[in-house]
């Protein structure tokens, strides 16, 4: 038996929610850093998916900071974006599987 959550809007069939990257967590950390008079550290903000991933397969950070972990991943030659040919300019990147070139 399904139980309805009154805090969640029921969507029409075929409609999915877009990930907000836990904007509430981002804002909370930004405000805290501003109050403390400092800049955010690399990896200080973690959406729920990143925090709960047991394999550390997800990375979140500031792509405008060339020294950040995410920036380095995005420059990796294995990085690609879905539907890149349509120039959608997504902020999510994927690393291809490492393949043995000599095989």
Describe each PLM feature range.
Residues 1-103:
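Non-ligating segments of multi-cofactor redox enzymes
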């Amino acid at each position: 038996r399904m139980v309805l959550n009154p805090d969640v809007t029921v969507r029409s069939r075929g409609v999915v929610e877009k990930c907000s990257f836990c904007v509430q967590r981002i804002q909370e950390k930004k405000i805290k850093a501003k109050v403390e008079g400092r800049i955010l550290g690399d990896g200080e903000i973690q959406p729920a998916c990143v925090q709960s991933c047991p394999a550390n397969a997800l990375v979140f950070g500031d792509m405008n900071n060339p020294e950040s972990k995410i920036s380095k991943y995005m420059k990796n030659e294995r990085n690609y974006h879905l539907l890149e040919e349509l120039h959608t300019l997504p902020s999510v990147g994927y690393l291809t599987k490492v393949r043995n070139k000599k095989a």
